[in-house]
Curated annotation (Swiss-Prot):
InterPro entries: Ribosomal_uL13, Ribosomal_uL13_bac-type, Ribosomal_uL13_CS, Ribosomal_uL13_sf. The keyword Ribosomal protein applies. NCBIfam families: rplM_bact (TIGR01066). This is Large ribosomal subunit protein uL13. Part of the 50S ribosomal subunit. HAMAP family: Ribosomal_uL13 (MF_01366). GO terms for biological process: negative regulation of translation; translation. GO terms for cellular component: cytosolic large ribosomal subunit. It comes from Glaesserella parasuis serovar 5 (strain SH0165) (Haemophilus parasuis). This protein is one of the early assembly proteins of the 50S ribosomal subunit, although it is not seen to bind rRNA by itself. It is important during the early stages of 50S assembly.
Length: 142
């Protein structure tokens, strides 16, 4: 019996919608990264993007445990001298709630062109509405 190797043109991708309300950030992000890579499928192939499209709604209602709401700090650099910026989890949720989930998932995906292709299949929205109704996404309970 030969080993099955998925081909990019034969991969079937489904659309799923996930409600992040009350979900723990890290546990949600690991499951999203797993599904974006396609590791939940029998035809998973490491060098082929076999993952599904995932829509995350209510990103502003994601939860963290312990004191991470005030203690977890996100850093970024503007590119200018002395341009290091930071924000706590609470400030990030108020400013850009989508970024919190995106950063968590992006760190769990492979680095390189394949990882970037997987990340493009993640669509995160702060509120309850998304503009992907035409794709008829299935509700995914995580």
């Amino acid at each position: 019996m030969k080993t099955f190797v998925a081909k990019p043109e034969t991969v079937k991708r489904d659309w799923y919608v996930v409600d992040a309300t009350g979900k723990t950030l890290g546990r949600l992000a690991t499951e999203l990264a797993r599904r974006l890579r396609g590791k939940h499928k029998a035809e998973y192939t490491p060098h082929v993007d076999t993952g599904d499209y995932i829509i995350v709604i209510n990103a502003e209602k994601v939860a963290v445990t312990g004191k991470k709401e005030t203690d977890k700090i996100y850093y970024w650099h503007t590119g200018y001298v002395g341009g290091i910026k930071d924000a706590t989890f609470k400030e990030m949720i108020a400013r850009r709630p989508e970024a919190v989930i995106e950063i968590a998932v992006k760190g769990m995906l492979p680095k390189g062109p394949l990882g970037r292709a997987m990340f493009r299949k993640l669509k995160v929205y702060a509120g309850n509405e998304h503009n992907h109704a035409a794709q008829q996404p299935q509700v995914l309970d995580i």
